Amino acid sequence: MTLSRRAFIKQTAAATAASAAGVVLPGVDALAASDSLTWSKAPCRFCGTGCGVSVGVKNGKVVATQGDPQAEVNRGLNCVKGYFLSKIMYGQDRLTTPLLRMKDGKYAKDGEFAPVSWDQAFDVMADHFKRTLKEKGPTAVGMFGSGQWTVWEGYAAVKLMKAGFRSNNLDPNARHCMASAVTGFMRTFGMDEPMGCYDDIEQADTFVLWGSNMSEMHPILWTRITDRRLSTPTTRVVVLSTFEHRSFDLADQTIIFTPQSDLAILNYIANYIIRNGNVNRDFVNRHTVFKQGNADIGYGLRPDNPLQKTARNAGDPNGSQPITFDEFAKFVSKYDAAYVTKLSGVPQNKLDQLARLYADPKVKVMSFWTMGFNQHTRGTWANNMVYNLHLLTGKIATPGNSPFSLTGQPSACGTAREVGTFSHRLPADMVVTNPKHREEAEHIWKLPAGTIPDKPGYHAVLQNRMLRDGKLNAYWVQVNNNVQAAANINGEALPGYRNPQAFVVVSDVYPTVTAVAADLILPSAMWVEKEGAYGNAERRTQFWHQLVDAPAGARSDLWQLVEFSKRFKVEEVWPADLLAKKPEYRGKTLYDVLYRNGQVDRFALTETDSHYRNDEAKAFGFYIQKGLFEEYASFGRGHGHDLAPFDAYHKARGLRWPVVNGKETRWRYKEGSDPYVKTGTGWQFYGNPDGRAVIYALPYEPPPEVPDKEYPFWLATGRVLEHWHSGSMTRRVPELYRAFPNAVCFMHPDDAKAMGVRRGVEVKVMSRRGYILTRVETRGRDKPPRGLVFVPWFDSSQLINKVTLDATDPISLQTDYKKCAVKIVKV
């Protein structure tokens, strides 16, 4: 829509009035005085909160963004990153042409990047993929995707890899951030994603943050918590962390614990609830079962690592056995005050204060967590154990009572998880190991039986290892910066990308660390340069239209995936016995079979909105986004993952699934709120066959690496307010760059004094794997206790993941970036 100055000023006033924290909208006066702009809705490009923004376009360029007053999530507010969204697409080094490593006029692994046409790029790329498939088979090709893919980009990638190339070697960077949340949900409830929603914030009495600095990482949700805390004096905020950060400013109770001991604290609270008679017996008896999870499961390291060799259940980390409530009670009884205080460093009075909040039946509790739980060698367990507390007390799936896993990326839920871009998954919580699930996917996709492989492919960490080992030879990376993001860069990621046996393609908008490590770089369109859809942390699916053109030469990731599929005849990638089951596919391309299958191409160009561009639909001659979405949605409709019809999302500010008969669901599993819960049951955890949630008995186990005399400090990595992930977008926004130009090493002043270093002094942060140079910060926003340092990872000039350990949770296969041993050396 086009707003007059008067209308825009009125809208701006409404947005300002909506602020609970006095946020000022940058540039409002200048914009109000300018000529009229064309404004449209879109979800924010950054975190998983899913804020709605109004995007102002003038002369074919995004010139302004501000909070959308009609968006339920943020109610007119945006954080500082959201306010500068208009600048993320206009960095001076934007990629606009494919770049191929060449020497003497042809591709060479040790060549220099040179511009090539899209046809040349795809010719070379297709040659490597075809040769690899012919010589080594589907397990030698792979793809690393993203929780920043749009829904249809992720879905197109799933089809290309798992159906077209018949390879499950597809994984998203959400493996680094949300995999433990997924396995936690699946083990406890049999279905992924939260049962509650953001509306719980306005109904809760207590907020408990477990390893989550919401003040900086989810600031808009933090403003809602702040509003609840300040407007309702009885509300309490508890923050647990391994170091002090900005969320401590609002906290009524703060707990700093020894890394990894959150597991022991969770069991202490469960023990407290049982000992003090606060178990909701009726709820537990009717709606839960108990299991003992396998322990001593290893740390996801290479098989020759001693910690893997000695792990008793490394081969079955997800295993469990049924137990009784009494056996569970006995199991957690060992987690008494003396034992847990010794492990965690937290005094009993603080443990009891926290435990009482969970135990009190009159107190509604929201538990929030993100990377502190998920990036954890026992992250799945941590997720299971916080659910234990809510299930024991019945504080779940009702307004204000919600265990809530926060999401780091804008569509880690909507794309990575729901679409099934993980190496073991298919859409709508289906998995490749289940023959019925494979059969259903093959039916929907019109594929011959046996097309989809039955074994999970290489996950994110394993992909780097297989690249290094020469077992993954044709590899495509889209919408992520994994050479900066992966742990143990020098040991695994970089040697893998530069292995002469590997041909690596990176699609990106800027020359990131990962792009520079590739053999072929493809320039991508981003955000509102294409039509898109994201799914946020509260199950809210949101659409946007293409609002501006991408730079000449750049193409969307969807276009790249689908156009590339035209290069492959079915007989070049499928075995003869498989093709014999569908002889009518002979001579057809993967494009014909996957994307012109009578379903994806059934919506004509005339169904696109004539007020907006749609480059992909124009390129392929049909409304490809709608076709992909509707085919994908057929997986979940009628199975508890119902999505609304495509056109509904362009009209709404997002809808929370399951959407049944046009109505979204705010609280799942609860009678009267969730249409899938049968009348008279109260609660029904229908992801599990028996309709019951699982309470797990799980122990404390130590991390794989702890400080010692040689490496006396814990290292934790993470983010800061001003930058997002690897900083490839935010560091190109001048205002955000100036606000926090470079990473620093936050450390305790007494540690700095003992070492003879002062604030601003250059030091090495060194582990057994590598080191970086950075500067000491003793007065900043983050205040580690003695013996721990914190270094953000946004700075490409300080690759802190040279230092980190590539240990993972053996169930979720997610990396632990929050704890390894380092030493600090004065330069």
Swiss-Prot record:
GO molecular function terms listed in the Swiss-Prot or TrEMBL record: 4 iron, 4 sulfur cluster binding; electron transfer activity; iron ion binding; molybdenum ion binding; molybdopterin cofactor binding; nitrate reductase (cytochrome) activity
PROSITE patterns: 4FE4S_MOW_BIS_MGD (PS51669), MOLYBDOPTERIN_PROK_1 (PS00551), TAT (PS51318)
Main location: periplasm
Entry PTM: Predicted to be exported by the Tat system. The position of the signal peptide cleavage has not been experimentally proven.
Gene Ontology biological process terms from the UniProt entry: cellular respiration; Mo-molybdopterin cofactor biosynthetic process; nitrate assimilation
EC number: 1.9.6.1
A Pfam short name: Molybdopterin
Note describing how the cofactor binds: Binds 1 [4Fe-4S] cluster.
Cellular component GO terms held in the UniProt record: membrane; nitrate reductase complex; periplasmic space
SMART domains: Molybdop_Fe4S4
SUPFAM superfamilies, A to Z: ADC-like, Formate dehydrogenase/DMSO reductase, domains 1-3
Catalytic activity entry: 2 Fe(II)-[cytochrome] + nitrate + 2 H(+) = 2 Fe(III)-[cytochrome] + nitrite + H2O
UniProt keyword list: 4Fe-4S, Electron transport, Iron, Iron-sulfur, Metal-binding, Molybdenum, Nitrate assimilation, Oxidoreductase, Periplasm, Signal, Transport
Record: residues binding substrate: W793
Keyword Oxidoreductase part of the UniProt annotation: yes
Function according to Swiss-Prot or TrEMBL: Catalytic subunit of the periplasmic nitrate reductase complex NapAB. Receives electrons from NapB and catalyzes the reduction of nitrate to nitrite.
Subunit structure comment from the entry: Component of the periplasmic nitrate reductase NapAB complex composed of NapA and NapB.
PANTHER family: PERIPLASMIC NITRATE REDUCTASE, RESPIRATORY NITRATE REDUCTASE
Protein name: Periplasmic nitrate reductase
Protein encoded by which gene: napA
